[in-house]
Structures are given as C-alpha cells and as structure tokens.
Amino acid sequence: MAKVKHNPDAAALIDKGISELEPFAQVICKRLRKIILSADPELIEDWKWGPNYYLNGMVCGYWGFKKHVSFVFFQGSLLKDKKKILLENPLNVHNRHIKFTDVKQIDDKVILEYLFEAIDNNRKGLKIIETKDKTIITPDDVVKAFKKAKVLAYFDSLAFSHRKEYVQWIESAKKEETR
C-alpha cells in the first residue's frame, strides 16, 4: 500500500473534538469510532475537517451537530443500501449519510456491513464518475440581490465549488428573512 500523508495528531484531535460535543453526540461518535476502527486494520484514522477514515481514498467520517450526528460515506452513492438507511443531498453525487439522534439507533452489524462494502469499493478503486455539467441554478431573488449589490460578476467568477456551497447555504435558511 502506498504511503499516505495523514495528520499525526489525528487521534488527539478526534478525542478533543468529541469531548467538546453535546453529551448525546459524544456517545454516538465514540460508538461510531469504535465500530469503524474494528472494521479493518488497514483503515487509517485521520483528521481533515473532522474525523475521517481512509483506505485507498476517504471511506467515511462523522461529526456531531446540535441535534444529530451525521455519519458520512464519501463514495456512498456506490453502496447498495440494502437497508434503505442512507440519505442523500441532491447537490452532492458522491456522499450518502446517516443521521443519528440517539446511540440506540446504531446497529453495529448494519454499520459494519456498510463499512465493509465501502472499504471493498475503495480497495477496488471504484469511483463516482461525475458528469461534466457544472450548472448551478441560482435562485432569482439571490441574482437580484447580487445585481443590486453589484457583486453578481464577482459571484459568477468564483469557482464552481464556491458558488455551489454559497447557493446551498442560502437555500438552507430556515426563515425567509435570513435568506
């Protein structure tokens, strides 16, 4: 296996990060971490933007939020999802995730099945083939606001990923006045 550059402080960063989460999320993250690390001895625990597990590419990661923990499979759209538990974001063709709000929702055997499949896919080098269509539909009200503020040209000059993230962020607003 090729030498992979990873954060040598990953374990300590993960410990610290988990300790700062809400108590319910700490329990869930610790359980997921234990399951993930038991899945394959070659799986590398890493820290990117949070806990990340690597074997011939990123396999999975997790993180706690105010009311849930999101467990992400980075090439999740390749998984068969026999239990129909994976959620998707229509703006992300790769990832699939599971939301947990209570540790009792975690079925170790099911998580391991999904992990084994994801690890096997990475070992085989399977990848999502993205279409070349990099179109973002920017809501009309956002375009109007950008024109009024004279920043539309700047927005259009941003990289696709930045524009996509910005539109997702705006569309995720729970109230119209915060849009």
Per-segment meaning from a language model:
Residues 1-179:
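Charge-dense, helix-prone N-terminal extensions
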